[in-house]
């Protein structure tokens, strides 16, 4: 027979051996300047909101999350049949990142060509900036999800 106490474990989704993380500004290979600042700010905001980790300076941090924006791209999904004006576009951001324990040198998480994208509608007065900002926010949430402990 199953014992009730042998079922689920109630514990945090995040590593319990980490309390602090440094998040330097992501570097970029993209010509879309400024996205690295938006992304870094969004990651810091999401770490503080979603996880038990505190973002601190590198000299006080248990871990460091570093990354590089590899590409920022816009794809047109649909155009107006008569004018060829884009009606629906996708803004995508591709990053490489590594989360490392500064105390041991151990890599806690590493991802290459990690991408998040968001649809936006220029014909509804949504600009490329709107698409980029939405992609940045989605990407920040996804990166913080990757900082959860392995099951």
Labelled PLM ranges:
Residues 9, 49-54, 59-108, 117-132, ...:
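Surface-exposed short loop/turn segments
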Residues 1-60, 70, 74, 103, ...:
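A structural "domain/chain start" motif
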């Amino acid at each position: 027979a199953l014992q009730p106490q042998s079922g689920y474990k109630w514990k945090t989704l995040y590593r319990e051996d980490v309390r602090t993380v440094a998040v330097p500004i992501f570097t970029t290979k993209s010509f879309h300047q400024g996205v690295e600042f938006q992304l870094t700010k969004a990651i810091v905001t999401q770490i503080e909101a979603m996880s038990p980790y505190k973002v601190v300076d590198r000299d006080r941090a248990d871990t460091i999350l570093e990354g590089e924006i590899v590409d920022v791209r816009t794809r047109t999904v649909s155009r107006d049949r008569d004018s060829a004006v884009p009606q629906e576009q996708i803004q995508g951001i591709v990053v490489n990142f590594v989360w490392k324990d500064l105390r041991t040198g151990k890599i806690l998480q590493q991802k290459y060509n990690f991408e998040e994208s968001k649809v936006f509608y220029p014909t509804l007065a949504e600009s490329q900036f709107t698409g980029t900002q939405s992609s940045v926010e989605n990407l920040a949430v996804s990166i913080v999800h990757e900082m959860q402990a392995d099951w």
